[in-house]
Amino acid sequence: MAGLRVLLCLGALLARQGSAGLQLLLNPSRANLSVRPNSEVLPGIHPDLEAVAIGEVHDNVTLRCGSASGSRGLVTWYRNDSEPAFLVSFNSSLPPAAPRFSLEDAGALRIEALRLEDDGNYTCQEVLNETHWFPVRLRVASGPAYVEVNISATGTLPNGTLYAARGSQVDFNCCSAAQPPPEVEWWIQTHSIPEFLGKNLSANSFTLMLMSQNLQGNYTCSATNVLSGRQRKVTTELLVYWPPPSAPQCSVEVSSESTTLELACNWDGGYPDPTFLWTEEPGGTIMGNSKLQTLSPAQLLEGKKFKCVGNHILGPESGASCVVKLSSPLLPSQPMRTCFVGGNVTLTCEVSGANPPARIQWLRNLTQPAIQPSSHYIITQQGQSSSLTIHNCSQDLDEGFYYCQAENLVGVRATNIWLSVKEPLNIGGIVGTVVSLLLLGLAVVSGLTLYYSPAFWWKGGSTFRGQDMGDVMVLVDSEEEEEEEEEEEEKEDVAEEVEQETNETEELPKGISKHGHIHRVTALVNGNLDRMGNGFQEFQDDSDGQQSGIVQEDGKPV
């Protein structure tokens, strides 16, 4: 052993004179070998250059001794730990330290079944005319043996695919084990080109706060050994789901053959599509589990109900439902319509309550074919409202009943409208008639006023004739005509007495008649002759008094 140490010291002294700037790159099978100056060597020995070799666990690696090829001198390999450890030599008297170590051509060291503990510094000693030392750095890489991906998704499909609810928070984590620690990267592929998300050593985690539809795709985590370049990756598909925004809508439609009805359950706006279940109500008899359900003729009954239950993967757990009810059309009664000869008229028919929607037709008679649109008949329909416009009305052709018929596969209803066609109105005749009626009414009012209020008309007449306002006038209401006929004889007697008094009055002096007049008005008051006589007597007394006064005044001296 003392002799070996002497040889090592001599070799170190000779190696100091070599070139220090040489770099060597070798690429043996499954190993990379490079040479770097001034690296670690045996204690107390400064080499000219150092090579770096890389191998993987369980693989084989070859470490070359310098850059020379061909025949070599005595070559010996050492492992540089705290103290140099002999591995193998051309000297046959020195057996290898382990069967895994052997020498190849040109003094290269072959190590089989690499282990992690093989990582370290190695030195090749060549003794020919002089001794040379060639240090080699061996790096042993391991893994990555696995890649573990964890995604905190909402749920997992039976095939293992993950899904997350739109708007939720999703955490991503990827880890791997390797020697040295691997470089971990995240990629996402939503379309054709992957997008890089980030990288880190050993593990990589990130969080997406609000999942959206454009974040649905394949997420890939890759772990790469920075020494060996070995890479492992795991790709996980993540789907983004969302439920329909509103409740399902049930409807009934006529089939393409127009012979039966189809139930439709629409619950759109979600992803993926929901599932459906149709039941017959009441009773809950299951009919089918498709979006469209065909009804049999026996099920086309008035008031029949059917229920659709929709289920989405994101809930609600009990599902969302809607109910559809079959019903025949309803038609309100229509009033009579009138059209003038040569004019136009529009008949309107409003249908309500029909499910499915009804087909509306216009007929002149329920046994005749439906009215077809033409220049004479204009038919317009908007939704469940239909209008029939008749142009150039004719009394012979168009007057009569018109039927509005509404029909669906549940039932049929009809209502009739009577159309009366008349001649146009004479406006001039109407105006003349109105004016005549107004004049007639005015005459009647005037006559009634004259009959019941004669004083008003008498005073008016006297004023227009310029009579003296000092005239004496006595008005006595008259009795009804029937009583006048019965008391006609009594009136004649009274008239004779009045005439006598009048004659006496005419004998008064002429001066009296110059300033005053006495008007005689005789009437029968309620057939009471005594009352009338008393009134007349009072009138006579007043007249006598006036006459006496006048005579006295005339007797005065002038």
UniProtKB/Swiss-Prot annotation:
Residues 477-506 have a biased composition (Acidic residues). It is found in: Membrane. Residues 1-20 form the signal peptide. Residues 448-558 are cytoplasmic. Pfam families: Ig_3 (PF13927). Keywords: Disulfide bond, Glycoprotein, Immunoglobulin domain, Membrane, Repeat, Signal, Transmembrane, Transmembrane helix. InterPro entries: Ig-like_dom, Ig-like_dom_sf, Ig-like_fold, Ig_sub, Ig_sub2, Ig_V-set, Neural/epithelial_adhesion. One of its GO terms (cellular component) is neuron projection. Gene3D superfamilies: Immunoglobulins. It comes from the Eukaryota. It is a single-pass type I membrane protein. Glycans are attached at residues 32, 60, 121, 150, 159, 218, 344. Residues 477-515, 532-558 are annotated as: Disordered. Residues 21-426 are extracellular. Residues 37-140, 144-235, 248-327, 332-420 form the Ig-like C2-type domain. The keyword DNA repair does not apply. The chain crosses the membrane at residues 427-447. Disulfide bonds join 65-124, 174-221, 265-308, 349-404. PANTHER family: CTX-RELATED TYPE I TRANSMEMBRANE PROTEIN (PTHR12231), DPR-INTERACTING PROTEIN ETA, ISOFORM B-RELATED (PTHR12231:SF253). This is V-set and immunoglobulin domain-containing protein 10. It comes from Mus musculus. The lineage of its organism: Eukaryota, Metazoa, Chordata, Craniata, Vertebrata.
